[in-house]
Amino acid sequence: MSFLNGLFGRKRDSSAELAKQRLLTVLIDDRYKLTPEMMAQMKADLAEVLKRYLPAIDAEQIEVTLSRGEAHDLLKADVPLRRTSEGPSNR
């Protein structure tokens, strides 16, 4: 079966790896004392500020995450933009 998975490129994270990632997330959240409510407020604040410059932001789809990088902990914001027929505005 692993031959078929290798052949078709299907790679799944082990449950141990998932558990490790979840634990790291909990530890990072605890280190910075960020509650789920604070993360939600940060997401809303980011959306509000970014919409001033990019009206095409899809605020409902913004994802804010904390993760551990090689040298630093990382705060990542994935901000999807709706595609529009208009070009960039000149403000």
UniProtKB/Swiss-Prot annotation:
Keyword entries, A-Z: Cell cycle, Cell division
Matching InterPro entries: MinE (IPR005527), MinE_sf (IPR036707)
A GO BP annotation: cell division
Keyword Cell cycle in record: yes
Keyword check for Hydrolase: no
Main function: Prevents the cell division inhibition by proteins MinC and MinD at internal division sites while permitting inhibition at polar sites. This ensures cell division at the proper site by restricting the formation of a division septum at the midpoint of the long axis of the cell.
Family from the record: Belongs to the MinE family.
Protein name in UniProt: Cell division topological specificity factor
Origin species: Chloroflexus aggregans (strain MD-66 / DSM 9485)
